[in-house]
Design a protein with these regions (language model features):
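Membrane-embedded architecture of ER/inner-membrane glycosylation machinery
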Residues: 2-7, 11, 170, 174, ...
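Extracytoplasmic catalytic/substrate-binding loops of multi-pass membrane glycan-assembly enzymes
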Residues: 32-58, 64-76, 86-89, 239-240, ...
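Transmembrane-helix signature of polytopic, membrane-embedded enzymes
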Residues: 11-18, 106-130
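Transmembrane-helix motifs of polytopic, lipid-linked glycan transferases
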Residues: 93-116, 153
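Membrane-interface transmembrane helices that cradle and orient dolichyl/undecaprenyl
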Residues: 111-114, 154-169, 179, 340-343
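Transmembrane-lumen/periplasm boundary regions of multi-pass, lipid-linked membrane glycan transferases
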Residues: 45-48, 136, 182, 187-322, ...
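Loop-to-helix entry region of an early transmembrane alpha helix in multi-pass inner-membrane enzymes
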Residues: 71-75, 84-104, 141
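Short acidic/glycine- and proline-prone juxtamembrane loop motifs at membrane-interface regions
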Residues: 136-147
């Protein structure tokens, strides 16, 4: 067997365990409930609007151009629909495949960065699939997972391979361009710092400094040309307002004086611990990080050149969201895998001490089990005042058993501790998602409301939404006409007078008896309520008058017996 075929055999053997495990758990989890608002339903709404109106160049939502994101994710959804028909199965399978691609690429990058330490490459995918934050966001139809694929591809093109020291600049340009088409210029924040700091971690960059920077600039320009191949026709097709929103508001508005998601500079610091869970509670990982000594290997320098500037730059941006760091999670996984590997290689007390084992994670699992077991007793004693915990109480006991078993599993002696932590984290995170689906399903299921609205649309009735509409009904109801944005006061009165058969969607924080009596449909919606009204009834109530009695009773979801309806006064 040649060296190349042996390497391929070892690579395929490494996939044997973690890849099927990830695919199995992720596919089960992602189909536990329909696409949930707001991220998944909004992405599907854009894809559906483009599809139904045959507008594949410019993303649209609710009949208007959507400048928040570039179109590549929507095109991938359309590719599946072209073969399988319009459905919500393919977009979810696509997200799982994107997650699997991240695992495979992360392992390949770890192998390139640390060719002399095979254990780092073997453990990297286990650490990446174990990151609870990344797994949960990978279950949503979002752009950051796809962006992470292109970021990993770009890094693989920069890092020297076993048979080629120079970067693959054409591949680097293509990955940058695909990143642009996924989420716009923010792709540069993820890849440019590592390229700029190339001479610090790459021998070829030190020896060929001028070529490194010249060809890197050419590759970035090439990626920009890929973006321009879409942007220029899109601008010509959609006009000046879309141009301004796409080129200035979409990216620049998040960088300086953000119009949404404005946070302080330090906001990401506590999120580091959330992003790296469960390993943040594994003492051996911390021991490995603190044991790293200079001079750092080239692979570690590359990871720091990727992670640290990205953290500083995103912290400097005015607009912040936790999932902006999803493309950095593979780098964090490789860094933690390397730290644990080097600690293991050096030997000594820290490499095998039980005090640095998984016991904090086991205690956390036992604590979660105890809470889930206690919820029904607290509920019966009238001690639960939070409706989220109240809804968990009726379905939490089986999950308490699960977390009890996972805690015991983490305390088992023997080898394979890292894989044990990873497997327990993956199953535990999927269990938490299943608990979420069972307990809070009605607050995130848009299908009943979407069917009611679609029926009204089919009859030619207008539909209005009080406040910002994020497309949460568009795909589930296969709706083809825009929903009007409404405002309280005279605007609502005028709209109701103009559309006597129209429906109005409102999102009150609290319900009252009139809502249960006169509304068409009521259901929990995320942390508030969603109420669908006949427009004249709502307008009459807003004037302080009593509307006429409806011939049909109010639809109360998930059921009229739902405990929160009994507390309405």
């Amino acid at each position: 067997m040649t060296d190349a075929s042996y390497a391929r055999s070892e690579y395929l053997r490494a996939l044997l365990w973690w890849l099927p495990l990830y695919l199995l758990v992720a596919l089960i989890a992602i189909f536990l409930q329909p696409p949930i608002p707001l991220h998944s339903t909004r992405a599907l709404a854009v894809a559906w609007d483009m599809w139904v109106h045959h507008q594949f160049l410019v993303p649209h939502i609710n009949g208007a151009p959507y400048s928040e994101k570039a179109p590549l994710l929507f095109w991938l959804i359309h590719a599946g629909w072209a073969v399988l028909g319009v459905n919500d199965v393919w977009p979810r399978v696509l997200m799982v495949l994107i997650g699997a691609a991240q695992l495979i690429l992360a392992q390949s990058l770890a192998r390139r960065l640390f060719p002399e330490h095979a254990w780092i490459a073997r453990t990297t995918p286990w650490m990446l699939l174990a990151l609870s934050f990344g797994f949960l966001y990978g279950l949503q139809i979002m752009y950051d997972g796809l962006l992470a694929v292109w970021v990993l591809g770009a890094m693989l093109c920069l890092v020297p391979g076993p048979r080629r020291a120079s970067p693959r600049w054409i591949g680097f340009a293509v990955c940058i361009g695909l990143g642009f088409l996924t989420k716009g210029p923010v792709m540069l924040v993820h890849v440019v710092p590592a390229w700029l700091l190339g001479p610090w971690w790459c021998t070829w960059a030190r020896e060929q400094r001028a070529r490194w920077y010249a060809l890197g600039i050419a590759a970035i320009i090439g990626g920009g040309l890929i973006l321009a191949a879409w942007v220029i026709p899109a601008i010509e097709a959609s006009g000046g307002a879309y141009t301004h929103a796409l080129l200035f508001k979409q990216t620049g508005g998040r960088v300086v004086n953000a119009f949404i998601h404005k946070r302080p500079f330090w906001w990401y610091v506590p999120w580091v611990f959330v992003l790296t869970f469960p390993f943040v509670l594994w003492p051996r990982m911390w021991a490995g990080l603190f044991a790293l000594r200079r001079p750092l290997p080239a692979g570690l320098r590359m990871l720091l050149a990727w992670l640290v500037p990205a953290f500083v730059i995103f912290s400097a941006f005015s607009g912040k969201q936790s999932y902006y760091f999803v493309p950095e999670l593979p780098a964090a996984a490789i860094l933690m895998a390397a730290a644990v590997t080097f600690l293991r290689t050096r030997g000594g007390w820290a490499s095998h001490s039980a005090w640095l084992g998984a016991w904090p994670l086991a205690l956390g699992s036992f604590a979660a089990a105890a809470l889930l077991f206690a919820l029904p007793f607290l509920q019966n004693a009238g001690k639960l005042h939070d409706h989220w915990l109240h809804d968990c109480a009726s379905v939490g006991a089986p999950f308490g058993v699960l977390y009890l078993l996972l805690g015991a599993f983490l305390l088992l002696p023997g080898r394979g501790k890292l894989r044990r932590i990873a497997g327990a984290s993956l199953v535990g995170t999927a269990g938490a998602y299943a608990l979420f689906a069972l307990a809070f399903y009605p607050a995130f299921d848009m299908r009943p409301a979407a069917q009611l609205l679609a029926h009204a649309e089919a009859q030619g009735h207008a539909i209005g939404n009080l406040g910002i509409y994020d497309g949460q009904f568009e795909f589930a109801g296969r709706m083809t006409r825009p929903i009007d944005r409404l405002y309280e006061g005279q605007f609502l009165q005028d709209w109701a007078a103009k559309h006597p058969h129209g429906l109005v969607i409102a999102y009150p924080e609290h319900l009252d008896a009139n809502t249960l009596r006169y509304a068409r449909m009521v259901q929990p919606y995320r942390g508030v309520w969603m109420v669908i009204w006949d427009a004249p009834a709502l307008a009459t109530l807003r004037r302080g008058q009593q509307p006429a009695e409806s011939f049909t009773p109010t639809i109360l979801l998930p059921a009229p017996s739902y405990w929160r309806y009994g507390e309405v006064k």
